[in-house]
Amino acid sequence: MSKSNESAVAFQTAIASIKLIQASSVLDLTEDDFDFLTRDRVWIATDRSRARRAIEACVYGTLDFVGYPRFPAPVEFISAVIAYYVHPVNIQTACLIMEGAEFTENIVNGVERPVKASELFAFTLLVRAGNKDLIGHAETNIREQLRAQGVM
């Protein structure tokens, strides 16, 4: 598969991930954690563990909710979560915190090649750049879902 085809497949996987995130009504987040994730204040070193927990709650919320074990999420899904939930001021930090994931194609083919934070960041930027319509109203959509669940 050519490099451009690989990129297109990865991008389409990220688009599908965003649609999956939008369809999911299960987030293992409190209102405070959601505000922490989406606010425009820069995360500092002491925020690292809270930031990781909040991002992982978005990635694994449904599995955690029903009590199933977690399995490694692919880069496309993690980048979609970061693009969808994390305020732009913290995207680089989120990518650093979540580095080590692998692309879907590598998981399927049994190839181990964890991505670096810089690669996750670049892919997250591609996801944000190509999906302004899907990402633009994320905070409003999620707040409505949290209110419907009685969390907010």
UniProtKB/Swiss-Prot annotation:
Keyword Phosphoprotein in record: no
Alphabetic keyword roster: Host cytoplasm, Viral capsid assembly, Viral release from host cell
Transmembrane segments: none
Family to which this protein belongs: Belongs to the microvirus D protein family.
Protein name: External scaffolding protein D
Encoding gene (name): D
Pfam families: gpD
Source species of the chain: Escherichia phage G4 (Bacteriophage G4)
Described purpose of this protein according to its UniProt entry: Assembles the procapsid by joining twelve 12S pre-assembly complex into a T=1 icosahedral particle, called 108S procapsid. Ten proteins D bind each 12S complex, which are formed by three pentamers of F, G, B protein and a H protein. The scaffolding protein is released from the provirion after genome packaging to form the mature virion.
Subunit record text: Component of the procapsid particle composed of 60 copies of the internally located B, 240 copies of the external scaffolding protein D, 60 copies of each of the viral structural proteins F and G, and 12 copies of protein H.
Coiled-coil residue windows: none
Localization per Swiss-Prot or TrEMBL: Host cytoplasm
Keyword match Cytoplasm: no
GO biological process, one term: viral procapsid maturation
InterPro entries: Scaffold_D, Scaffold_D_sf
Record-level GO cellular component terms: host cell cytoplasm
